[in-house]
Regions:
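Charge-rich, well-structured scaffold segments of protease-associated domains
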Residues: 2, 7, 62-217
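Structured core elements
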Residues: 15, 28, 186-189
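M16/MPP (pitrilysin/insulinase) zinc-metallopeptidase core fold and M16-derived inactive scaffolds
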Residues: 21, 26-90
Length: 218
């Protein structure tokens, strides 16, 4: 399996690995904007923004997003860690363009409505409650705080109830504009396809993404 890399004019890195033995297509977008890039007042915003991304776009509702993934027989995932926020979709190889278009729509055209923001904030509060009642999570959080103190690595990826309560649409929109740009994104895919095709589809669906500036760890 050969790995190839092309950098688009807007800074987006396009990486492919061809695998002729599989009938599946896996695509992911990795954004260089995990919790290490947050200020203390922003703590939790990277994870919050990740949650909001699948809630609807200018062309699709949340239900339509989920229905399209189901119709394709695919599955999607998203996660946030200290360094990155990532989004992925897996479908049959013949549905690869549909997956790329959907992922681009989700990342470029998400609409963060006040109702969805309030609803998703409560979802994250529930995640916090579950973590607070999980001994492994409590240990890991305590260890990070002890070792790193007030540095970004010492803060919880989920944020706190105080910081999340102060994060609204203006803050989420600003975070997305700052972080979800060509200089911060890597589009990576694996399956039975040619690298040149992936580059062409990346230019077609991600070409309007602004270059922006590379995010700096705090």
């Amino acid at each position: 399996m050969q790995t190839q890399l092309t950098v688009l004019n807007n800074g987006l890195h396009v990486v492919s690995k061809k695998d002729e033995t599989t009938g599946m297509f896996n695509i992911g977008v990795w954004c260089r904007c995990g919790s290490r890039f947050e200020t203390p007042a922003q703590n939790g915003i990277a994870h919050f923004c990740e949650h909001m991304t699948f809630k609807g776009t200018t062309t699709r509702s949340e239900l339509e997003i989920n229905e399209q993934i189901a119709d394709l027989g695919g599955k999607s995932n998203a996660w946030t860690d200290m360094d990155t926020t990532a989004f992925s979709i897996e479908v049959l190889n013949e549905d690869r363009e549909a997956a790329i278009e959907l992922l681009a729509d989700i990342l470029l055209n998400s609409t963060f409505t006040e109702a969805n923001i309030d609803s998703e904030r409560q979802v994250i509060f529930q995640e916090m409650y579950e973590d607070e009642n999980d001994s492994d999570d409590c240990f890991n959080d305590a260890f990070s705080q002890l070792v790193y103190g007030s540095q970004p690595l010492g803060r919880d990826i989920l944020g706190s109830r105080e910081t999340l309560g102060k994060i609204g649409k203006p803050e989420l929109d600003a975070w997305r504009q700052r972080c979800y740009c060509g200089e911060n994104l890597i589009l990576s895919a694996a399956g039975n396809f040619e690298h040149e095709e992936l580059v062409r589809l990346a230019e077609k669906y991600f070409g309007k993404l602004p270059r922006g500036q590379k995010a700096v760890r705090l």
